[in-house]
Amino acid sequence: MSTTTTEARSPLPLLLRRGRSSTALSASTAEARSPLSILQFRRRSSKDVRNITSVSSSLLPAFGTFIEDDNPSSKPFIVLHFDRRYRLWELFLVILVGYSAWASLFELAFEKAAEGALLTIDLVVDFFFAVDIILTFFVSYLDNTTYLNVTDHKLIAKRYLKSVAFVMDVASTLPIQFIYKTITGDVGRGQAFGFLNLLRLWRLRRVAELFKRLEKDAHFNYFVIRVIKLLCVTIFWIHLAGCILYWIAYHYPRPTDTWIGSQVEDFKERSVWLGYTYSMYWSIVTLTTVGYGDLHAVNSREKTFNMFYMLFNIGLTSYIIGIMTNLVVHGALRTFAMRSAINDILRYTSKNRLPDTMREQMLAHMQLKFKTAELRQEEVLQDLPKAIRSSINQHLFRSIIEEAYLFKGFPEGLLVQLVSQIQAEYFPPKMEIILQNEIPTDFYVIVSGGVDIIASKGVSEQVLAKLGPGSMAGEIGVVFNIPQPFTVRTRRLSQVIRIGHHKFKEMVQSDNDVDAKMIIANFMTYLKGLNDELKKEIPFLRDLLDDADAQVQETVQSEETPQSNDEEIVTVSRHENGQIEERRREGVPKRVIIHGQAPPNQDNKNNGDSNGRLIILPDSIQLLFDLAEKKLGKRGSTIAMADGAHVEQIDALRENDHLYIF
């Protein structure tokens, strides 16, 4: 084996030479890379996770602030605005807001309805909102400038009293009609009471805040929330317009010259629900621009209102159509993108006259890319913190990495680093993952599916092996730093883990030498177990395995331990029982070139091997003679340098010396 070939194909560069002892380095590395410091986290229940997702949209603490997990507020009689129970109270009030919005307009248009049961219901509803006013003085709030949760009683009360919300809350909660009846003994039937009741529409802001929060809550479907919001807006607008239309007709001086009086002459004496039905019917017909003609504006007041009503309907209809179009189109964007990508592939293959096999592979890969879009971790995890991404990778791929032969016996810290940097990919059937003779940039661990190891024989191909989940592909080219010796092709839909060459090399070289030795030991054991067909495809593999066995043999037989400097060399061997043996010797491993002939400057030149053999210098002269006999095919008795000087001590030799053994 030539010098260049041995240097390029030797896996020994992965063995790190340290200036300090392996024991000290291992201890320091273990301390620095303790898995407990990396993976230690507090487990959260599903309830905790739900609380986090609900709080995150409304509570944004400033940097450097700390909020306790159990009770962020240590002050008594304080209700946290993001507390789950307070959220339920707000939801209950939203239901009452819906009634208030309907009743205030209904009582304005139909005065007779405000005297009956609705008056009692209004009092009950106002009572709950009065309780909420008192409760607001004890509810924390989020400071918009510091983003801190304020729990001070004085600050909460001062902020609420100085706000417009306090004045409007009190005004919309006062039961003015009931107070008037209590004082005067007469039921207030004037229009003033109806308009004062419209102050209750101020409560609609609670509905807007609820939808704003639900749209950002991951527990609810965004499409459904937006549709419900549009439906509520439409129903409220129909109810508002219908009540105003009836109020205009009811208070017009000539009842028969109104839109409803022309159809029902005595509509004022008829049932309230009859008038409400007519009002809703005409409001819906006008909103939808159907216009049957059975109901129409008669007097100038109704015509004026209808003009503004239809103008507003144009904007409302445009808003609803725009929102619905956006929601529907958003769901079809992925399909449109896939169709566009497929059309681009078809045009490209047709223009460049690519064969059908390549076209089918490109189409299959593109379709698989869109089908597995939700499973590809890069797009899902790219915006997450590194710690969360690492935890997800540990959960998904830790077990499969531990089963791979190359990483068996790996320390915890190195496994954490490796799993944190891997990437998962999907490949459709009959897709080449690795091409023969390509540059070894990555190697793969098969998670699911299966692949074939293929060697090209001219125009034909030969399947050398079939690999399943847990197997590795492409690692031979990466470790030896040679062009990939085989083609790797999927048999069916396969998920693989891709590990980059440079990242793997940097990670191993930055760790202690014990980890590198473990990789080499596992790798050499795997190479010895390859079938003969695979070994034939790697010409230098047999010589490399023989050299490794010879080095182990020399290390076992060596009794000398020369000291040269502070560096330490560790030799690893794996016994048949699976145990790994480590032997240490001081000094940098020296590589020398041996020749089976006398030095060329002497008269008695032999016709031996002029190219020489590159070997690692053993520990003694006797072992050097034994190794030379095995490599050169003949045993010598003398060792000389190129200048003819005889070698008597092994320590006198230097790196890349030419030794002539004869």
From Swiss-Prot:
Q: Is this entry keyworded Membrane?
A: yes
Cross-referenced PROSITE patterns:
CNMP_BINDING_3, KHA
Q: Which residues form a coiled coil?
A: 528-558
Q: Name one Pfam family in it.
A: Ion_trans
Residue stretches spanning the membrane: 91-111, 119-139, 164-184, 195-215, 230-250, 302-322
**Transmembrane helix is among the record's keywords:** yes
Gene Ontology molecular functions: voltage-gated potassium channel activity
Signal peptide segment:
none
**Ranges where the KHA domain occurs:** 591-662
Which terms are listed as keywords in the entry? Coiled coil, Ion channel, Ion transport, Membrane, Potassium, Potassium channel, Potassium transport, Transmembrane, Transmembrane helix, Transport, Voltage-gated channel
Intramembrane segments as residue ranges: 278-297
Per the record, ranges on the Cytoplasmic side are: 1-90, 140-163, 216-229, 323-662
Tell me how this protein assembles: The potassium channel is probably composed of a homo- or heterotetrameric complex of pore-forming subunits. May interact with AKT1 and AKT2. Interacts with SLAC1.
Concerning its family, UniProt says: Belongs to the potassium channel family. Plant (TC 1.A.1.4) subfamily.
**UniProt protein name:** Potassium channel KAT3
Q: Which organism is it from?
A: Arabidopsis thaliana
